[in-house]
Amino acid sequence: MSSTYKLNHTDSFANGDAKSLLPNPENGFTHLTSLAQSEKAVQELLLQQTPMQATDDHLVEFSEALRTVAKALRGAAEGKALAQAEAAEWKRRYELERSKNVELQHKELSNGVCADESNGQRMEHLAKSPRLYAQEISSNGMETICSHEVLQDGGFNSFNNKLKRKASFKLSWGCKGMANDQHKKEIVSFERGNISTAERSSKQISLTWESDPQTVLIITKPNSTSVRVLSVDMVRWLRTQKGLNIYVEPRVKEELLSESSSFNFVQTWEDDKEISLLHTKVDLLITLGGDGTVLWAASMFKGPVPPIVPFSMGSLGFMTPFHSEQYRDCLEAILKGPISITLRHRLQCHIIRDKATHEYEPEETMLVLNEVTIDRGISSYLTNLECYCDNSFVTCVQGDGLILSTTSGSTAYSLAAGGSMVHPQVPGILFTPICPHSLSFRPLILPEHVTVRVQVPFNSRSSAWVSFDGKDRKQLEAGDALVCSMAPWPVSTACQVESTNDFLRSIHDGLHWNLRKTQSADGP
């Protein structure tokens, strides 16, 4: 190419510039010295043109390289902008959700009042307005939480003139073997610049009735003859011997009336609106069945849940410590009080759809007592789930799915997937993968105050499916997200002895945990 470039310049010089250097033939003479000078000038010009050609070649190559780099930088900038826009969108949705939860909590707390009145003033105050939970210190220095709510009958047309006031109670936290009152009143102390914490695991929660319970709700396991026989006997005993008002499910009321017309005193509900007001009526909830019956009973209450007394009449029960054969003695002791209870935390979950038409359009909030499961369903592809904890990236799940479990659900699906068994009163969220395609993917236990977001990325090969305590199955498309956090309303279940004793006994009896023949003492 350079030779062609020289040739072109030579032709141009011969056709134009050379003529200007030679003498005009019309003058009649030719000077040899002038011709030699002309040839020398041509050689000098050729020498000057050669480095110019090389410089032009380098400039062309450099400009092409700059265009290539600019194109690559432009593509990277566009990709980064898209990623930042997507992250900003999820952050905005999360902040809107969090602010909404904070507003709801402030509204709930604003309805509460401190319990500083005397007993006479307290009853007068209860007649005027309901009070939620207020913390106080009892006369013996024990930390308590009182719950007083006035029963309002306006929501039930069929329940008028049935009941005027709901029973009140208080909860007490007691430390074993701790004589120092400081550990009874404070979780964290910082006296004299020294930080100390009380041992929360040693605290057993007790429920003491301040007024007699008046209303009991009984939830039964369906399609069981033994449960039906026991429910008939229990309803009759609670009514005739204890004078309590009885609520049952519509199905159970029909069964009781078919048994005898004398059960016409039993009350029930007709629609979801009446169910939503049950917590203002019911003082105690009794379940006859297994853990599934407890889950069903808890799912009926989208807010506060009355204390539950679970009787074991199922195949396996980690939350049902009471035996049905001694139900009268058990209920006598519970109605009299005080009783030890286990506070079982729940998760509140909702789905945010990518195709939502408004800025913030979540679906109905679901409450789970055991776990929420995200799996691949019938798809032959692995699930691809991006997981975040308070907007911090956790990991990308590639496997059969993921389990977000409460500590009460640690002995259920999470245990089968390799998760640890955790005491139900330990507040936390279990993060357990289902058959992950990674040897290093081990389960996690996250603190109770975090918010976990699981979303299906846009490049996922398939959708995912989510279920809440094994029901209400929903599909998650690409771009959809599931947001889970700890619910403000726990489920309190009565203990036969105390919380830790019941938990250890349940894993020994239900799972035969660490059951092995004892090694003989006369070994080799």
UniProtKB/Swiss-Prot annotation:
| Activity's dependence on pH | Optimum pH is 7.9 at 25 degrees Celsius.
- Listed GO molecular functions? ATP binding; NAD+ kinase activity; NADH kinase activity
Residue stretches spanning the membrane? none
Kindly state the tissue distribution recorded for this protein. Answer: Ubiquitous.
Quickly give the catalysed reaction: NAD(+) + ATP = ADP + NADP(+) + H(+); NADH + ATP = ADP + NADPH + H(+)
Q: Which cysteines are joined by disulfide bonds?
A: none
Gene Ontology biological process = NAD metabolic process; NADP biosynthetic process
Region of interest (Disordered), residue spans: 1-25
UniProt keywords, alphabetically: ATP-binding, Kinase, NAD, NADP, Nucleotide-binding, Transferase
The protein's Enzyme Commission number: 2.7.1.23, 2.7.1.86
InterPro entries hit by this protein: ATP-NAD_kinase_N, ATP-NAD_kinase_PpnK-typ_C, NAD/diacylglycerol_kinase_sf, NADK
Q: Organism's domain of life?
A: Eukaryota
Concerning what turns on (or off) its expression, the entry says: By gamma radiation, hydrogen peroxide and infection by P.syringae.
Q: Which residues lie in Polar residues bias regions?
A: 1-13
Protein family per UniProt: Belongs to the NAD kinase family.
Q: What does this protein do?
A: Phosphorylates both NAD(+) and NADH, with a twofold preference for NADH. Source of the cellular reductant NADPH which is an important antioxidant factor.
Annotated PANTHER family: NAD KINASE
Give the protein name, as stated in the record.
NAD(H) kinase 1
Source species of the chain = Arabidopsis thaliana (Mouse-ear cress)
